[in-house]
Amino acid sequence: FKVKPFYRMEDLEGLKTTDALPGEFPYLRGTKKDNNEWLVRQEIRVECPKEANAKALDILNKGVDSLSFHVKAKELNAEYLETLLNDIQAECVELNFSTCQGHVVELANLLVAYFQKKDYDVKKLRGSINYDFFNKMLTRGKEKGDMVQTGKALIEAIQPLPFYRVLNVNALSLNNAGAYISQELGYALAWGNEYMNQLTEAGIPAAIVAKKIKFNFGISSNYFLEIAKFRAARLLWANIVASYKPECVRDCDNKGPNGECRCAAKMAVHAETSTFNLTLFDAHVNLLRTQTEAMSAALGGVDSMTVTPFDKTYETPDEFSERLARNQQLLLKEESHFDKVIDPAAGSYYIENLTVSIAKQAWELFLSVEEAGGFYAALKAGTVQAAVNESNKARHKAVAQRREVLLGTNQFPNFNEKAGDKKPVEAKCCCGGGKEHTCEKDVVTLVSDRAASEFEALRLETEASGKRPKAFMLTIGNLAMRQARAQYSCNFLACAGYEVIDNLGFETVEAGIEAAMAAKADIVVLC
């Protein structure tokens, strides 16, 4: 769709989105009526349960109210869980878990037993177990197990914890692979609908299935479009769930005109800042990227959020970078009060139109997937992966041509920065296994290289060669003309890690040549 240069009041004419109210179906303006509160989540990869517990208790005192534990399946047992969750007040903090997909039911049983042993009020327990059959196909090419069988067993096992969600729609994987906003949303809706369709056909009530689904979206740097994306997501998902006519499974005041459960139509949304646009060089610029992304998600009304530490591209985040990531969200809450105002974008000529445009394009994609047999069939055929990989290719081309700007990488790079020991970090399985790309593949996978990867490879290769070619700017003539050309040339060559020697200007060409020879330049650029 096309975005106009500006919008006016008449652009709102005919838009039904302006009639929506906060906390009311179809939840365009959010699922909450009183505030815009969201949970600050931090991830913990559990190598030692005792150390992970100590870290969790520490960060809970520093503003975190949602924890995400990545646990190793081979170490799972009651004692392990007891150590991991020791002294954590589960009624006061959201607990989220991911492990090997073949052990999620075991994890659910252990969690239920632990909470029952501690005699917690189950109505106060909030959290999730990350079961995502389809994400494993997307990222690792593995079609393992039976989604319906595992899904049914998992929902049954977690039944004593009514507010725990166990079916994950990890659209973050699409975002990190370079998917455009409408692609991410359209495929996420088809992903969620696949759970709804298959599990309701297996005999599970629609309301129960819907209340067990959690969406995990990525956040790109398209500030206003991301705000609109979250608004459109809730609108579309509410209508998808409503089409299943979910019946209330408990007493509820939030019923539709035909008695359907409208609570089931609420989309549970976790958002995480994207890694696609993060960079290895000039890495502190990542803080600017993730800050604007966090603002988009907060204004878009997400339920919880993870801000990716700025150094994740080249090392395991340390205490410093994790503290900065936490504080980025806390600043939005405590200093900017983003958690106090519900959907401040409502009525905006621009954002209301963006919401409708994104919703329409995502809905068209959703329908095309459904017409082709659904999300599962599309994954097996490879059409989802092919479309997203094509977007990845197009965005890499845009970055190469500087139509998509990565500050510090393809535009205004730091001339003197060296990578040193920095090396791109390769992804690992969430259950603590090996590298993702080493696994044998049953289906085509997503290409999840970052937008900056090709520029970084060029700079790293230059640095590894042991000699940085010197590029000498021989500037002469009109001041404005020569500066413009010198600046362009400096940026262009510095993107490859070349040593750039800029100059104020020479009176004659001979003087410039003499200076270039004295500098032992490998390249001379006449500006």
Predicted region positions:
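A glycine-rich phosphate-binding loop feature that marks nucleotide/adenosyl-phosphate handling sites
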Residues: 1, 130-134, 170-176, 211-220, ...
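Catalytic alpha/beta active-site cores
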Residues: 1-222, 226, 247-258, 263, ...
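Intrinsic disorder at enzyme termini
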Residues: 1-29, 303, 361-471, 477
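Conserved, mostly hydrophobic/aromatic
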Residues: 63, 119, 237, 300, ...
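Intrinsically disordered or highly flexible coil/loop and linker segments, enriched in small
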Residues: 65, 90, 121, 160-164, ...
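Mobile "lid/hinge" segments at catalytic clefts and subdomain interfaces of large enzymes
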Residues: 154, 159-198, 288-366
